[in-house]
């Protein structure tokens, strides 16, 4: 990036993408989050080849520092939300595995006929 304002604009674009990704994570829109991550990574790659020169004004450096801090905070929050989702999925997988093991071991129990038989036997007493 040749222009310092272009660099600032690139940082602001990454911030915008970061905020959108955080909103997607908060709303549990995981597929959209994954799709947006590709765009986000491409934007990060653009600035990774750039550097802030020593001639960059202090106020511009401060703006970029503030933007980076917000981006990092957003990333940490996204990671927490992703970990929470991973834990939920792990729990569901464990439950499904246990259910499959029970079904394999004992066969699948028909819920309704058993329930009706149980209800009929208690009504007759």
Curated annotation (Swiss-Prot):
Annotated segments matching region FliD binding: 60-98
Main localisation: cytoplasm
NCBIfam families (UniProt xref): PRK10548.1
Cellular component GO terms held in the UniProt record: cytosol
Function field: Dual-function protein that regulates the transcription of class 2 flagellar operons and that also acts as an export chaperone for the filament-capping protein FliD. As a transcriptional regulator, acts as an anti-FlhDC factor; it directly binds FlhC, thus inhibiting the binding of the FlhC/FlhD complex to class 2 promoters, resulting in decreased expression of class 2 flagellar operons. As a chaperone, effects FliD transition to the membrane by preventing its premature polymerization, and by directing it to the export apparatus.
Organism per entry: Photorhabdus laumondii subsp. laumondii (strain DSM 15139 / CIP 105565 / TT01)
A Pfam family the protein falls into: FliT
Subunit structure: Homodimer. Interacts with FliD and FlhC.
Family of this protein: Belongs to the FliT family.
Database matches in InterPro entries: FliT (IPR008622)
Renumbered residue ranges of the record's region Required for homodimerization: 1-50
UniProt protein name: Flagellar protein FliT
């Amino acid at each position: 990036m040749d222009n310092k304002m272009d660099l600032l604009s690139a940082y602001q674009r990454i911030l915008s993408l970061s905020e959108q990704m955080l909103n997607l994570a908060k709303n549990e829109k995981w597929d959209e989050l994954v799709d947006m991550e590709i765009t986000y990574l491409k934007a990060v790659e653009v600035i990774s080849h750039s550097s802030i020169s020593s001639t960059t004004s202090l106020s511009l450096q401060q703006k970029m520092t503030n933007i980076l801090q917000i981006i990092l905070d957003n990333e940490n929050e996204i990671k927490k939300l992703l970990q929470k989702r991973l834990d939920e999925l792990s729990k569901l997988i464990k439950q499904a595995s246990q259910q499959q093991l029970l079904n394999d071991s004992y066969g699948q129990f028909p819920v309704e006929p058993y329930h009706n038989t149980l209800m009929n036997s208690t009504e007759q007493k």
